[in-house]
Amino acid sequence: MKMTAKMRREFPTAFLLLFLVPVMIPVGEAVWLDVPPTGTKCVSEEIQSNVVVLADYLIISEDHEVMPTISVKVTSPYGNNLHNMENVTHGQFAFTTQESGNYLACFWADEKSHGNKNVSINIDWRTGIAAKDWASIAKKEKIEGVELEIRKLEGAVEAIHENILYLRNREADMRTMSEKTNSRVAWYSIMSLGVCIAVSGFQVLYLKQYFEKKKLI
C-alpha cells in the first residue's frame, strides 16, 4: 500500500502518539480473582457516562475434579442490574454506561460445586477504545496498516480529551461542593457565636437580678 502525502505528514505524529497513548489512557486489563468457598469477590472501576464496557470471565480449573460454577452480578453506581448470571463457568457482559461513577462486578462460588476450594477466575475487562472491535472496523471500512493505526490513535486521543473534560467537570463539582460546605460551616460558626453571646447575656442579666434581690449589689 502506497502512503499518501497526508499519511506521510501524519506518520511522525502517529508514531509519537503510539508511545504516549498507552501511558495517558488505560486500554484494558486482565484481572485474576481467587474466590473463596464462602464469600464474594468484586472488581470495580470508576467510569464516566457514554463509555462502552466489555468484559469476558472464565473459570480456571486445575485442581478441581469437577468444574465449579459461579454466579456473577454487575451493577451501576445507582444500583441498577446490568448483568446477572448463575451456575456458569464462563460468560461475557457488555453495556454502555448511562451514568458516571463506580461500576461493580461481583463473583461468588455456587454451593457444593467447588469442593471447599478457592475458585480462580480470569477477567478481561476493557473500556472505551479498548472495547472496540478494530478487526471488524478495518474489514468494514477497508483500511489497514498505518491508516488503521492512525484511526486507533485518533480514537485514543478523543478518549483522552473526554477523560480530561470529565475530570474538569468533577473538579468543578467538587469545588462547588467545597464552597457550599465552607459557607455552611461559616454560617454555623456565626450562629453558634450568636447563641453563645445570647446565653452569656442572659446569664449576666439573671445574675444581676439575683444579686439585686439579695441586696448584694
UniProtKB/Swiss-Prot annotation:
Residues 40-152 form the GOLD domain. Probably oligomerizes with other members of the EMP24/GP25L family. Associates with the COPI vesicle coat (coatomer). Associates with the COPII vesicle coat (coatomer). The chain crosses the membrane at residues 185-205. It comes from the Eukaryota. This is Transmembrane emp24 domain-containing protein p24delta3. Its main location: endoplasmic reticulum. Pfam families: EMP24_GP25L. InterPro entries: Emp24-like, GOLD_dom. Residues 31-184 are lumenal. Residues 1-30 form the signal peptide. The modification Omega-N-methylated arginine is found at R170, R175. One of its GO terms (biological process) is vesicle-mediated transport. Residues 138-160 form a coiled coil.
